[in-house]
Amino acid sequence: MPQLNPNPWFSIMLLTWFTFSLLIQPKLLSFTLTNNPANKITTTKPTPWTWPWT
């Protein structure tokens, strides 16, 4: 059964992951973010609805 033979597919998978992790990933991580992430801790309490019949 050829689909169970891992010889070509395993090497292709390893080559793909090494290419991604060594060449593409550092180039993607070198970009600067346009908006700096900020902590959003502000919590607002909802205003209760005033029912006209109570």
Swiss-Prot record:
User: What processes in GO biological process is this protein linked to?
Assistant: proton motive force-driven ATP synthesis
What this protein is called in its record is: ATP synthase F(0) complex subunit 8
Transmembrane residues, as ranges?
8-24
> Could you tell me the superkingdom of the organism this chain comes from?
Eukaryota
- Membrane keyword on record: yes
The membrane-topology field of this record reads: Single-pass membrane protein
Origin species, per record, is Gallus gallus (Chicken)
Give the UniProt subcellular location, in the record's own words: Mitochondrion membrane
Q: What GO cellular-component annotations does this UniProt entry give?
A: mitochondrial membrane; proton-transporting ATP synthase complex
Q: Could you state a single Gene Ontology molecular function term?
A: proton transmembrane transporter activity
Assembly information from the UniProt record: Component of the ATP synthase complex composed at least of ATP5F1A/subunit alpha, ATP5F1B/subunit beta, ATP5MC1/subunit c (homooctomer), MT-ATP6/subunit a, MT-ATP8/subunit 8, ATP5ME/subunit e, ATP5MF/subunit f, ATP5MG/subunit g, ATP5MK/subunit k, ATP5MJ/subunit j, ATP5F1C/subunit gamma, ATP5F1D/subunit delta, ATP5F1E/subunit epsilon, ATP5PF/subunit F6, ATP5PB/subunit b, ATP5PD/subunit d, ATP5PO/subunit OSCP.
What Pfam families is this protein classified in?
A: ATP-synt_8
Name the family the entry cites: Belongs to the ATPase protein 8 family.
Q: Which UniProt keywords apply?
A: ATP synthesis, CF(0), Hydrogen ion transport, Ion transport, Membrane, Mitochondrion, Transmembrane, Transmembrane helix, Transport
Name the gene that codes for it: MT-ATP8
Q: What does this protein do?
A: Subunit 8, of the mitochondrial membrane ATP synthase complex (F(1)F(0) ATP synthase or Complex V) that produces ATP from ADP in the presence of a proton gradient across the membrane which is generated by electron transport complexes of the respiratory chain. ATP synthase complex consist of a soluble F(1) head domain - the catalytic core - and a membrane F(1) domain - the membrane proton channel. These two domains are linked by a central stalk rotating inside the F(1) region and a stationary peripheral stalk.
